[in-house]
Amino acid sequence: MKLSELFNPNEFAARHLSFGDEAALLAAVGEKSMDEFVGNTLPQSIRMPSELDLPEALTEADALAKLKGIASKNVINKSYIGLGYYPTRVPNVILRNVLENPGWYTAYTPYQAEIAQGRLEALLNFQQVCIDLTGFPVAGASLLDEATAAAEAMAMAHRVGKVKSERFFVDARVYPQTLDVMKTRAKYFGFELVVSDFAQADEGEYFGALFQYVGKDGDVQDLQDVIGRLKAKGTIVAVAADIMSLVLLKSPAELGADIALGNTQRFGVPMGFGGPHAAYFAFKDEFKRSAPGRIIGVSKDASGKPALRMALSTREQHIRREKATSNICTAQALLANLAGMYAVYHGPKGVKRIANRIHTLASVFADALVSDGLKVVHEVFFDTVTVDFGSKEKADQVFAAALESGYNLRSVNNTQVAAAFHETSVYEDLADLYRAFTGKDTFTFADDVKGRLNAELLRQDDILQHPVYNSYHTEHEMLRYLKKLEDRDLAMNRSMISLGSCTMKLNATAEMLPITWTEFSDIHPYAPEAQTAGYRELLADMENSLKAITGFDAISFQPNSGAQGEYSGMLAIRRYQEAQGEAHRNICLIPKSAHGTNPATAAMLGLKVVVVDTDEHGNVNIDDLKAKAEQHRDALSAIMITYPSTHGVYEEGIRDICRIIHENGGQVYMDGANLNAQIGIMQPAEVGADVLHMNLHKTFCIPHGGGGPGMGPIGLKAHLAPFAPGHTLTDTHSASAGQTSVAAAAFGSASILPITWMYLTMMGKQGMEQATRWALLNANYVAKRLSEDYPILYTGKNGRIAHECIVDLRPLKAESGITETDIAKRLMDYGFHAPTVSFPVAGTLMIEPTESESKAELDRFIAALKSIRREVQKVIDGEWPKDDNPLVNAPHTAADITGEWAHPYSREEAVFPLPFVREHKFWPFVNRVDDVYGDRNLVCSCPPMENYED
C-alpha cells in the first residue's frame, strides 16, 4: 500500500457530492459517462476550452489551518471609532443556538409560512423592538444596512410626499458612508441633495429630509422644533437613529418624524468588518403600502388560530417588477433574529443597564478630560466624546498614543479626535484612554456620575413591555425558547429545499466555523488598513478565484445582496456610458421570463424597460430581440439576461444575443442567479457578458439565513472596472476609487466571505467543476423521473435541462381543480419545502435540487410528488371530494389528527402518506395561513401573550 494514496486532498468534494450514486443516476437519464452526459446537455459553442485555473483542493483541516493563518494577520485593537459600528457582546446562548445552528441559518425566506412560524415569530420580535424604540406603529423585518435604508427612506419620501420638489435635505451630521450611498441613489432618481446644518433644514422647499440622531461626532440635538417646521410645509422627515441611544432618548415618532431607520448591530451582532447587520426601518401606518422590504404580519390559519406570514407582498419586485417600491428581494433575517433575541434575553432592564453604562462611561471620561483642561466639543452626547486639541500635532499625538496602547480612535478632522464608547467598554479602557489623551497615569472618578443628556431629551415611556421580553432571562428559559421556535421551522438540516433559482445547497460546517472567529468578527470596517491584512489577503484570494471562474477582469465585493449586485452592475454600465458621452442611452431590454429584480433595478437607475418575448421553448426570441435592439440602437443601454435562462435551459443563442446587443451600442449584464450551472464548463465573460453579479449565498455556499444575509459581488470587464462602487472612507485599491458607493461598508458583508473562501479552497479546481456537473445530473434525474407523471415545460438540447426544471401543473389544475398552492402545501405533510411556485410561469413548480443532495433524498422527494399525483387522481376520479381532500386541507397539524375527524380520508393518509415520512416526521405548526385576512387586517407587532399560549 502506498502512503500517498492514504492522503486524500479531495475528501471534502466527496462529502459535498454523492460520488457513489453516479452510475445509477447516469443510467436513469440514459447516459454512459459524465462526460457524455455534459456533452449532450451543454451547447458545444459555449464550452470552456480549458480547465479552471484554480488551486488544488485542501482537506477541511488544512483549509481551516490556512485560513487561521490568514485571519491571524488581522490586528484586533479595541475599537472606539464609532460611526455606526461598535463592539458588542453576543450572548453565548444566542451565538450557539441561532448563529451557529443550521436549524436557523439554512432555512429559506419564509414564503411557505406554515413551516416557518419559528423564525417568523423571531422576526416579529425584531419588529416589535423597532416599534417600541422608534415609537412608530409599523416596522419592517430588516433592510441591508443603515446607508441603504436611508436611501430607501429618501425614495419612499418622494413616493408618499406631496411637496412638488426634487430636492432632499440631508443633515450635515449624517454618517459619511450614508451620504455616499444617498448620492449614488439620488443621481438616477433625479433628486438634488442639499447637505447643510440641521437647524437650516426649514429654509428651503424639500420633499424630504434626513436627520442623524445621534450625530456622527457624538452630539445629541433636540430635533423637535426643526422637524415641526418642516412638517408644517409638508416635508416627509426621516431620522437615522442609533438603536442603543433610543433606549434612553425620546423616540423619533415623539420628535415628529415620519420614518426612522438605523443599524441594529449594537444589539448583539459582531462588527465583522462591515457586516452583515440588520438595518431597521419603521414608519407611520399610512405609509405601509409604500415601504421597502419584508414586513411580518399576524394573520390566522384555516382553523382560526393566530398565524404569522410575510405581509403586503404586492409592494415587492417579484410582483410589481419595475413599479415595485424597491428592488430589494431579501432582508437580513438571521441578523435581525440575533438583534431581536438580544432584546428578548436582556429584557427592558438589561438593555437600559447596557445603554446607561455606555453613556455613563462616556460621561466619566468627558468629565475627567474637562477637569484636565481639555476642550470637549459637545456638551450633550450619548456615547461619543469628541475633543478639540487646537492643533494637528497634538491631535495626531493623541491618536498615535491610543493606537500604541491598542485602541482605535476616530480622527474627526485635523484638530479633533473622538472616542465612541460601547457595550464592551470597561474601567481599564477609561484609564488607558485618559493616559493617551492627557499623558497622565492617574485616573480617578466618583461612582455617582451625572450624565450628559438633558432631561428634555430623555424617553418617558416604557419599552419592551410585551411578555416575550420579560420571560426568558435565564439561560435555560432562553435555550428552550430558541429550541421551540427552531422546531417550528423546516430547514435544510431536515430535508432538501428544492427552490428553483435559489440554489439551496449544502452549507458545510467547516465553511461556517470561521465566521465567529474573533479575527474576522471583531474588526471595525474603518479600522486602519495595517490592521486588516488578513481580510485584504482573503479578498485578494477570492478575487483571483472568481476572476478565474467567470473570466472577468475585476471583482467588486461591495454589493451586500444579489439585488445590490444587480444595481451595482447596471450602475457601472450607466457610469461607463456617461463617461463615453452617451448618458442618453436609457433603454434596457429584459426578457419576459426575467426575475422581478431585473426591471425593478433598471427603473431605479432611470432606465426604461422594453420587454423581449420568449419563444415556445422558453428561449429569448432572437428575432424580437434583434428588432427591438435595432429599433432602440441610438438609446440602447443594456440587456439584463439570466444564463442558463430562468426557464432552466442553456439557450443556444447566447453568443448571438450578446453580439446583437454590442452591435447596437449596448452592454450585456448577466444575472448570476444560475451561475451554479456554469462553473468549470463555461465562462460568462467569454460568451459575451460585460458584467455579472454572483450570489455567494447561492452558488458559493453562504447560507440563506431564513431570508438573508446574502452577498452579490460583481465581475466586470476592464472597460467597466473603473465604474464599480468606490467608498468614501476605505481605500479599496481598485480602479473605481473615487466613485460613490452602494453599501455602507467597502466590502459589503465581509465577515461571511470566509464561507465562500472555504468552499473554493476545499473543492479546488476539480471539485468546482464536479459540482456543476452534479447539479446538472441531479436536475436531469429529477426531471426524467417526474416526467412520468407531470409535463416538464421547457427542455433544451437533446431534451435536457440545465440545473433546474419547470413542472407544469396547469393541465392537472384544469382537470382536477387542485392548484399549485395545494400541491405546495401538501408537500409539507411529506416533510418537504415546496419548490418555487408560479415563477417564472404561473401554475408551475420550478425545481432545483443542487449538486449536494444524495440520490436517496432525491428519491424521497420524487416519491412525494408521485404520491401527490396519485392523490390528485383520486380527486379527478371522484374518490375524494374537491373541497375535502388531503391537498386542499394541507398542511395537517398534530392538533388535526388528535381532534375530531370527519374527512373522507384517514388520519394516516393525512400525515403519514408514505413509509419514510414516519421515520422523520416534520409537523407543521399551523394550518394553511389566510393571506387575504392578514393583508386586510395588518398587524406587524407581537400579539397578546394568550395567543402564544393557545
Curated annotation (Swiss-Prot):
This is Glycine dehydrogenase (decarboxylating). Keywords: Oxidoreductase, Pyridoxal phosphate. It comes from Neisseria gonorrhoeae (strain ATCC 700825 / FA 1090). The glycine cleavage system is composed of four proteins: P, T, L and H. GO terms for biological process: glycine decarboxylation via glycine cleavage system. Signal peptide: none annotated. The gene is gcvP. It comes from the Bacteria. InterPro entries: GcvP, GDC-P_C, GDC-P_N, GDC_P, PyrdxlP-dep_Trfase, PyrdxlP-dep_Trfase_major, PyrdxlP-dep_Trfase_small. Belongs to the GcvP family. It catalyses: N(6)-[(R)-lipoyl]-L-lysyl-[glycine-cleavage complex H protein] + glycine + H(+) = N(6)-[(R)-S(8)-aminomethyldihydrolipoyl]-L-lysyl-[glycine-cleavage complex H protein] + CO2.
